[in-house]
Amino acid sequence: DAGHQRKGNSAKEPIGPGASQTKPKVASGTHGNASGLNEYELTLQVSLKLRDELQARGYQVYMIRETHDVNISNAERAQMAANQGADILVRIHANGSDNTSVAGALTMAPSNSNPYLGKSVISASQTLSRKIVDCFCAATGAKNQGVMQTDTMSGINWSSIPVSIVEMGYMTNRTEDLNMASTSYQTKMVQGIANGIDAYYGA
């Protein structure tokens, strides 16, 4: 799932099945001041390369989006993946911070007390997230910020299959932003994510 889309959708949806708390269906995402890229552009660039790499490794890949002009909520993205019979959902994103010196990669997974997901999905999501962030940082040299456990992400809470949100780096950090926009670094990121998926499956 290449995170975001050209136009955000501020209409609200429950953060999980049966939840009273709501969030915008799709945030507009962050922006690279140095690269000039929008997050939705970067995530699709990387996701298309990741698709090709995973297919070359023998995986079947289902893309949530392959263009910018879509309107798919985070809950819908999670449900689409499961409805396609996917085994895992990998959500490609980039980070942002008010502090421009902050840099590094992290993944997001549900906590053990997530009220929307079963224990097996929670455990597998945490494992998938750990494998991806470790392999990603090994491939790229990015600072490893580890696995952030969160139960406020609609795109996690609506997933009936193991899921990880990959925050590849900070578009608000000049060096990391320019790295992520470069073809050579994108290749390293893709290799790292694919290596993490391989590691998850024990390949």
Where is each model-derived feature located?
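Catalytic-site microenvironment of enzymes
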Residues: D1-A203
